[in-house]
């Protein structure tokens, strides 16, 4: 059975004002094309439990992996802009590998708050591997993107990187959140190139934010001792650091109200997600109009 690890495990305290009283809670926007960003949100919420969270999933344009780059940039900027007009946002987390690699410069030019992106956890995986073989499990777009190749060259040059690009796992993760069972035989078939390798990877990077939602199933299918590494806790630590050190917490707007989710189009599938979103701590939902 595989073991799930993350890029670190430290937890920072909630920010306090200089007089020792609790600070106004920051409003944090987490954005993804689908529900994969919930894996990032969950890690951030454990680190900053008192923050006010907004989660947007772009179910109208999901998935982003096969979309043209300029479409994604324009789309992400428009969505963050629409949320900016409705809420007093202190921090934006782009919880999508595809969107992060191409849209962060445009977002940082337009919005005067810290913006965090997600990249595959190749650097920690290269440190953790015992046999020097690291698997990168991601969407085809992430596997093919030059940004990913640069990460491998920079941080894992002495490792053998086995890349596996798949869109099917994204659909499986979405279905799992709807309460559907993940068919393990199908998962084994998708991972067959690694499972049949003479020496499979002993460390696997979950290079899409959807994939930690399937960690239990991946652990059941991959060889005993395989380590799963994702970026969730690293993003959470970065968010906590920014809240503590890069924001004047006394000037936060302190937006009130329940944590809220937004979709871009109301569908039966989006409505069916509400029980799961409630379990994640969201108290209301709405539709975002661009």
UniProtKB/Swiss-Prot annotation:
Instruction: Supply the InterPro entries for this chain.
Output: Asp/Glu/hydantoin_racemase (IPR015942), Asp/Glu_race (IPR001920), Asp/Glu_racemase_AS_1 (IPR018187), Asp/Glu_racemase_AS_2 (IPR033134), Glu_race (IPR004391)
From the UniProt record, list the reaction(s) this protein catalyses: L-glutamate = D-glutamate
Query: What residues form the catalytic site here?
Result: 96 (proton donor/acceptor), 208 (proton donor/acceptor)
- Asked if the keyword Cell wall biogenesis/degradation belongs to this entry, the reply reads yes
Tell me which EC number(s) this protein carries. 5.1.1.3
Query: Mind listing the GO molecular function terms for this protein?
Result: glutamate racemase activity
Per UniProt, which keywords does this protein have? Cell shape, Cell wall biogenesis/degradation, Isomerase, Peptidoglycan synthesis
GO annotation terms (biological process): cell wall organization; peptidoglycan biosynthetic process; regulation of cell shape
- Which positions bind substrate? 32-33, 64-65, 97-98, 209-210
Q: Which domain of life does this protein belong to?
A: Bacteria
Q: In what pathway does it function?
A: Cell wall biogenesis; peptidoglycan biosynthesis
One Pfam family from the record: Asp_Glu_race
**Which family would the database say this protein is a member of?**
Belongs to the aspartate/glutamate racemases family.
Q: Show the PANTHER family listed in the entry.
A: GLUTAMATE RACEMASE
Task of the protein: Provides the (R)-glutamate required for cell wall biosynthesis.
NCBIfam families per UniProt: glut_race (TIGR00067), PRK00865.1-1 (NF002034)
The protein, known as: Glutamate racemase
The species this protein belongs to is: Sodalis glossinidius (strain morsitans)
Gene behind the chain: murI
